[in-house]
A protein has these predicted regions:
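Active-site-proximal alpha-helical segments within enzyme catalytic domains
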Residues: 179-183, 223-244, 298-315, 327
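Short, gly/Ser/Thr-rich active-site loops of penicillin-recognizing serine hydrolases
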Residues: 320-373
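A short, well-structured edge-of-sheet supersecondary motif
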Residues: 46-76, 307-310
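A small/polar active-site loop signature that marks catalytic segments
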Residues: 139-213
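Active-site SXXK
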Residues: 42, 64, 81-107, 134, ...
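Bacterial N-terminal signal peptides
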Residues: 7-17
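Active-site helix/loop module of the DD-peptidase/beta-lactamase fold
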Residues: 82, 101-139, 159, 190-227
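Active-site Gly/Thr loop motif
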Residues: 208, 256-310
């Protein structure tokens, strides 16, 4: 191949790569053209800076268009962010895809997949535990199993006492999500990260996702995934669209419906977003919304009634306060029809979003990305 021909081929590859990157990037639009108030978004940012220590990023989607996006320096658009337990919503999506492919059923007993790791005499309640109970965090445990390097994680989970009848007692349980990941790996021969790549990450244009693994080489599932803010937003938009992306059904709509509906009761306080119920690794919210969330304020909030998605990364200890600012300031920003153009307010919003930074005195709560040192 001549040098000129080689350069030409490289140019074509470059062009195709750029075109593909543009193709999977969400479209941008002015807030008012999508019925969203620029002023209200700006007031959300200003209030968040006053009341929340500290946001890292925010992206607001309306009718499939990004209408506002901002990063608190040193965070940036291309920098992946650790999702903590927001990872769970991605892991449960892998379970849904494996179910759709006939590789398992949510009513399969958990012990079916790990006979070699089962206790010598499993209890009747452990025998009753199903994949469905892992998804809804209703495993029957009184508290979370603890993992260590001294025993394989699956064996540790199965050795943990099950005092309650599975399916009747909600107990937040990250190891239950690890078990979902282990089951997907068992039935597909791939880690959840590998399994989701052609089915979810590649179609959505989620580039180079990273996921922490257990000592046994299983993606940890319930935490440890790192992606960019726009990737979170695209994931939420996929769910808002009932699993359809670019006219292709990536995730069955029936799974989306089950995963985001109330499957387990989590409390009775109408003012608390953690008391609105739990689906398949998604929380129900006030205002008929649902979300995936993770420690220190990671959110993928889906608002079907507003046809909107809000993606937020953060490093705060008061996640309810963070959601309160969303409901108080962002929710009223959405209007039923397009608003008159408002160049002045749009300019003020852009200026505010361009001038964000993490406070110098902020104490960092986040952990390192998978694979980092």
């Amino acid at each position: 191949m001549s040098r000129l021909h080689f350069v030409a081929v490289l140019s074509v590859i470059n062009f195709i790569s750029v075109a593909l990157a543009d193709e999977v990037r969400l479209p941008r639009s002015s807030p008012e053209s999508q019925g969203v108030s620029s002023k209200a978004i700006r007031e959300f940012v200003e209030t968040a800076n006053q009341k929340i220590d500290t946001l890292h990023s925010v992206m607001v989607i309306r009718h499939g268009h990004v209408v506002a996006e901002g990063w608190w320096k040193p965070e940036s658009a291309e920098k992946p962010h650790i999702l903590h337990s927001l990872s769970k919503s991605f892991c449960s999506t892998a379970v849904g895809l494996a179910v759709a492919e006939g590789k398992l059923s949510i009513d399969d007993p958990v012990l079916k997949f790990f006979p070699e790791d089962a206790p010598e005499k499993p209890s009747d309640k452990l025998k009753q535990m199903r994949v469905r109970d892992l998804l809804t965090m209703s495993t029957g445990h009184e508290n979370e199993p603890k993992f260590s390097d001294e025993m394989p994680w699956v064996k540790s989970f199965l050795a943990h006492p099950v005092p309650h009848k599975p399916g009747t007692h909600f107990q937040y349980n990250s190891p239950a999500t690890y078990m979902q990941s282990a089951i997907v790996q068992k039935v597909t021969g791939q880690t959840v990260l590998e399994y989701l790549k052609p089915r979810l990450f590649d179609p959505l244009g989620i580039q180079s996702p990273a996921w922490a693994s257990s000592p046994q080489g299983v993606s940890v599932g319930g935490w440890g995934l790192a992606v960019r803010t726009e990737d979170i937003a695209k994931f939420g938009q996929l769910y808002l669209q009932k699993g359809k992306w670019n006219d292709k059904q990536l995730v069955p709509a029936s799974w989306i419906e089950q995963a985001t509906s109330r499957q387990a009761s989590t409390g009775s306080d109408p003012a608390r977003d953690w008391d609105q119920g739990y689906g398949f690794q998604f929380w129900r919210c006030r205002h008929e919304a649902y979300r995936g969330d993770g420690a220190f304020g990671q959110f993928c909030i889906v608002l079907p009634e507003q046809d909107a998605v809000i993606a937020i990364t953060a490093d705060t200890k008061d996640m309810q306060a963070e959601l309160n600012v969303v409901w108080d300031k962002l929710l009223p920003a959405f209007h039923a029809a397009a608003l008159p153009a408002n160049a002045d307010e749009e300019a003020k919003l852009k200026a505010a979003l361009a001038d964000l930074s993490v406070p110098a005195n902020h104490t960092n709560n986040t952990i390192k990305l998978p694979g980092s040192k």
